Curated annotation (Swiss-Prot):
It is found in: Cytoplasm. InterPro entries: aa-tRNA-synth_II, aa-tRNA-synth_II/BPL/LPL, Phe-tRNA-synth_IIc_asu, Phe-tRNA_ligase_II_N, Phe_tRNA_ligase_alpha1_bac, Phenylalanyl-tRNA_Synthase, tRNA-bd_arm. Its main location: cytoplasm. Mg(2+) binds at residue 256. It comes from Geobacillus thermodenitrificans (strain NG80-2). GO terms for biological process: phenylalanyl-tRNA aminoacylation. Keywords: Aminoacyl-tRNA synthetase, ATP-binding, Cytoplasm, Ligase, Magnesium, Metal-binding, Nucleotide-binding, Protein biosynthesis. Gene3D superfamilies: Bira Bifunctional Protein, Domain 2 (3.30.930.10). It catalyses: tRNA(Phe) + L-phenylalanine + ATP = L-phenylalanyl-tRNA(Phe) + AMP + diphosphate + H(+). HAMAP family: Phe_tRNA_synth_alpha1. Its EC number is 6.1.1.20. SUPFAM superfamilies: Class II aaRS and biotin synthetases, tRNA-binding arm. This is Phenylalanine--tRNA ligase alpha subunit. Pfam families: Phe_tRNA-synt_N, tRNA-synt_2d.
Length: 344
């Protein structure tokens, strides 16, 4: 019996050493230490041995079992370490390779222009007023001297949600709302940036959604000369020193008198080029003195208070400033277009 136990120990230790992976090692464990293994059979056959041999054989069997168990544990630890090393080698990262450059974000050219315009007027003492894009018919039209039946209220020009609610067609409603909050007392000095909506067919110069920045000043003794001085300063800050502006008569229901405002061409210095179409001037915005009806509807005494208003499209200014020929580029999120402005 002793020889049998020693032989089983040698066989088991040899097979443990030969095991190449954890599965093979577990097979050895089951074969020698399992319920049907030879060590278990020896222990079960102890009853057939003479009484004086049982303690010795039992002790030897336990020693053999313990030796095999220790060998199994040592081999398992070794195999697990080798497996970890193989995985590390397979998943190794070559830290000497150059890293992938991080793609940095950059302000959108339109956002850049809007913020630049806001900063210019904030520097002149204006505050920024924002309001709802879904507006009532009253604030979008009627409070701005656009009564029922006015052509600008045509369903073909505006996105109506109900008969009395629509997507705002300009940011002028914020002028009426702000004047109402002042309860007939000046001064009022605001700019109103935001998205507006028109039922236009999208093309190179038109979009159903675009942005506007409108300005309003209301106080005692506001004159046309104040408007011109403000816009001249704006043009010089935005397009460069030496720029001049000119007023051309126009019509807007909410201002009287109304003007179109041109800036001297910043490409040809007024000599005539393709940008200014040979005239030396570029149209940039509309403006005028606030109509007395608009003042009265907002609660201001038009005999005591006067004011001026102006409105511009940041898309047009950005197109002029950066030489962009299609307004749709601003809204297509084409990186080939946007990456041109990384250092603008």
């Amino acid at each position: 019996m002793k020889e049998r136990l020693h032989e089983l120990e040698r066989e088991a230790l040899e097979k443990i050493e030969q095991a190449g992976d954890l599965k093979a090692l577990n097979d050895v464990r089951v074969a020698y230490l399992g319920k049907k293994g030879p060590i278990t059979e020896v222990l079960r056959g102890m009853g057939a041995l003479p009484p004086e041999e049982r303690p010795k054989i039992g002790a030897l069997a336990n020693e053999v079992r313990e030796a095999i168990q220790k060998a199994l544990e040592a081999k398992q630890t070794k195999l697990e370490e080798e497996e970890v090393e193989r995985k590390l080698a397979a998943e190794a990262i070559d830290v000497t390779l150059p890293g992938r450059p991080v793609k940095l974000g950059n302000p959108h050219p339109l956002t850049r222009v809007i913020e630049e315009i806001e900063d210019l007027f904030i520097g002149m003492g204006y505050t920024v007023a924002e309001g709802p894009e879904v507006e009532t018919d009253y604030y979008n039209f009627e409070a701005l001297n656009l009564p029922k039946g006015h052509p600008a209220r045509d369903m073909q020009d505006s996105f109506y949600i109900t008969e009395e609610i629509l997507l705002r067609t300009h940011t002028s409603p914020m002028q009426a709302r702000t004047m109402e909050k002042h309860r007939g007392r000046g001064p009022v000095k605001i700019i109103c940036p935001g998205k507006v909506y028109r039922r236009d067919t999208d093309d190179a110069t038109h979009s159903h959604q675009f942005t506007q920045i409108e300005g309003l000043v209301v106080d005692r003794n506001i004159r046309m000369s104040d408007l011109k001085g403000t816009l001249r300063e704006f043009a010089r800050k935005l397009f460069g020193e030496g720029r001049d502006i000119r007023f051309r008569p126009s019509f807007f229901p909410f201002t009287e008198p109304s003007v179109e405002v041109d800036v001297s061409c910043f490409r040809c210095e007024g000599h005539g080029c393709s940008v200014c179409k040979g005239t030396g001037w570029i149209e940039i915005l509309g403006a005028g003195m606030v109509h007395p009806n608009v003042l009265e509807m907002a609660g201001f005494d038009s005999k005591t208070y006067t004011g001026f208003a102006f409105g511009m499209g940041p898309e047009r200014i950005a197109m002029l400033k950066y030489g962009i020929d299609d307004i749709r580029h601003f809204y297509q999120n084409d990186l080939r277009f946007l990456q041109q402005f990384l250092r603008v």
